[in-house]
């Protein structure tokens, strides 16, 4: 049967059932078509929408709703037995749609999520069982199936998880997803706490936590009972509850076994979403200092976190400059995080009250690196060193010494391998490397080197941002 014929047959079965809701054969044919599509891994959107059409109608018309009378329980009648049959088909179909969340085709996975959420919203206001003392209940069992599929999949589900952001405007959705995330903090088995689970869990948190504390107040000016704030159930979810959830979850996830990917993901989440909600940011000290030693992008993100703690929370880190100093190695020129490293170093070294021995060590280390740097990075280094000298005029003597011959390269007292910048003998050295760059084959490099060594230097610093192409608030290093 051709694709067109199959679609026509499917549509015909949907219409036949909607015209006669006792037509079990037509309903069974639709569900069988769904199973067949899943088994043969053919496009699923059409069959998902067909099932959505059927069960949305059954939910809204209450054709599946069984009324439970107080003290009498569920009546055993042919009508209720048929409704029970329809409910079973509904649950069967819902489970099939859940499987589609893992589809390789993003459009199918997105449609599966949209349909699941539509079922949840409608079922919440049109429950499968009604009682005399009717109260709207959130279908948390179905939501749990969605969240569990996203978390426990043996693949990265980011392309589906990001679509959940469309529902974070609803207080009840956020309230119950947080409940489920807290429930899943401790997986059933150790095997479940794998890299895929951790990445998916962190991605869910990234969707749920607003970038700033006030971003989840979209409807703050509306009445608390405004139905636009709720998917199906009026339930309070406020800033205080968000803060409580974030703090509880952070204390768990920071202790999970992380590889480089999840460690980087965790740090980005911390910097962009979590930190502003933490009740005791000082407790991050050990974690960030330990992470600084990992290397690469992870260390740089940890450095960003320490920078925030220093400037926003008045915390001190005695050996932070040693950590920063150690990051400047030849490998940085081949890594994506290079602009961010220079940007942060520029901020950390912005104070004019820093010891000259410390600043001189950074200037000298960068000068040495300029000899092996690509041309575009040599320019950044030269302007960076120039700015350090403008901030600390006492360093001009390093240029003067170099201009007067300085030290023979073989007799340079500077210790490049010394971990402590204050013990590197940078002040006893000279910036002879910049003198060498004045003879560089590329005119714009040689001219820049001449500008740096010219006396006097300009009063205003060079704007590194033009060369780094990095925004001050950009900490998303992926």
Can you describe what each PLM-predicted range is?
Residues 314-478:
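Eukaryotic scaffolding regions of large macromolecular assemblies
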Residues 1-324, 348-351:
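Alpha-helical solenoid scaffolds in large eukaryotic transport, assembly, and signaling factors
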